[in-house]
Amino acid sequence: MEKPVKSAVAKNTLSFAFVVGTTSLAFVVSQLDVSIVNIALPQISKSFAADISKLQWIVDAYTIAFAVLMLSAGGMGDLLGSKRLFTIGMIVFGIASAGCGLSWNAISLISFRVLQGIGAATMIPSSLSILNQSFAHDNVKRGRAVALWTAAGGVSIAAGPILGGLLIHISNWRMIFFVNIPFCLAGILLSFKLRESQRHPNKGFDIPGQLTWMITLTALIAAIIEWHHLGFNNPIIYGGLIFSAIMLVIFLLIEKKAKAPILPLDLFSSANFNVLIWMGIVLNGSYYGTVFVLSLYMQDVLRYSSLAAGMAFLPLTTGFIISNLISSKLMAKYGTRIPILLGLSIGIAGFLALLIARADTPYWQLFIPFIIIPMGMGLAVPPMTTSILANVAKTRSGTASAILNTTRQAAGAIGVAVFGTMANGGAVAIVHAIGMSALISAGGLICSALLIFRYLRTT
C-alpha cells in the first residue's frame, strides 16, 4: 500500500514568491533559448557556413527533443516526483548550454541543442506540476502563480532577441548559450528547499509509445525542413510524410492499449481540454515560426545589425509584461474565458497588421504589430494554462501540463519548419514568408477564438 507523500510545498512553509520564483527559472531559461538563438542565426551561419536548412535544424533540434520527451517527462514526474525531475532537468540543461557555447561545427551545435531540449522537457512539466500542487487549495492563488510563471516565460521569449543582440554586440554568438549557466545553478540550489510532490511509484513507463512518438515527430519535421532543398517529388520527402502519418496512427493505437500511456487519451474526452490544446498549438506554431522569419527579415532584408535587430524586438517584451499583469487581474474578476477571447482577438489584429512588411518598411510601422501580437499572447496564455490544469485531477497535473507543452513545442517546431521553408530563397522569399505567416497565423487564431467561444466553459 502506498504511503501518502507530502505535497510539493507545505502550506505556510515556503513563501508564494519563493515557489513561483524558483519554478519560473525553468521556464525562463527554456523559453529564452527558443528566441535568443534566432537573433544569432546570421552569425552562426557565417561561423559554420550553414544554409537555412541547417539553421532550421539548429532551432528545431531543441524544440523537437523538447516535444518528443515532454510526454514521458510528465509521466516521469508523476512517477519519480516533480522536484527530483526539476533538479535533474536544470543540471542537464546547464551542461548542454556549455556544450552549445563550445561547439565546433553545425552538427555539434545541433547535437547539444538536442541535449538542451531533453533538459527543458524535464524542467517544464515538473515546474508547472509543483505550482499546481503547491496552490491546489486556493484557485485564486494558483491562477496568480500560473500567470506569473507564464509571464516569466513570455517575457523571456520576447526578451531573447534583445539579450541576444546585446551579448553578440559585446562578445559573440557563443555567449547566448553561456548566459544560461548562472540561471541553471540558481535553479539547482533553490530547488533543494522545495518539498517533493505526490508520487506514484507503481506507475509503468510507456517505452513503445515514446519511441513511436519520437519517430512520428522527427520524420514530419525532417520532411518539411528538407522540402525546399530536395523538392516534394523526392521520395524522401513524400515518403517521410506518409511514414510520419503511419507512425502517428501506430502511436495512437499503442496509447489506446497501454496500461500507463504517455498520452492518456481519456483526457481528450473533455471539450474544454481539446479546444485549449488546439489553441496552444496555434499560438506556438504562429509565434515561433513568425519570429524565426522576422529575425531573418531584420538582418538579411532590412540589414539591421545584431544589436539593432535585437532592440527592434523590444516591443515584444513590453507587450508581454503589460498583458500578463492585466491577465491575472482579468482572470480573478471574470474567470478564464473572457481573457482568452480578448487575447485571441488582439493577436488576430496584430498578425494582420504584419501584412505591411515589405523590403523597405520603416520600423515605426512594424512597431504596431510588434507590440500588439505579444499583448494578445500574454492575455490568452495564462488563462489557457490555468484552464488546462483546472480540468484534470491534481494527481494528473504533471501529465496534463506535459501534454500541453508537448503539443505547443511540436507546433513551434512545425511553425519554424514551415515558415522557414517559405523563406528559403533570399530577400524576396523572406518578405513573402512574412505575409504568408501573418495570414496563416491570423486564420489559426480566428479558428481558435470560434472554438473557445463555442465550447469553453469558464473555470
Feature map (PLM): residue ranges:
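Membrane-interface helix termini in secondary transporters
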Residues: 43-45, 74-75, 79, 166, ...
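Extracytoplasmic
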Residues: 18-60, 123-124, 128, 291-295
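Hydrophobic transmembrane-helix bundles of small-molecule transporters
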Residues: 147, 169-279, 304-305, 311, ...
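Helix-breaking motifs and short loop linkers at transmembrane-helix boundaries and internal kinks
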Residues: 47-49, 81, 102-108, 171-172, ...
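Central cavity-lining transmembrane alpha-helices of secondary-active solute carriers
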Residues: 60-74, 124-128, 314-326
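Extracellular/periplasmic helix-loop-helix junction of adjacent transmembrane segments
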Residues: 40-70, 108-110, 307-312
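Helix-loop-helix hairpins in multi-pass membrane proteins, especially solute transporters
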Residues: 78-208, 394
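12-transmembrane solute porter fold
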Residues: 16-29, 37-39, 235-243, 247, ...
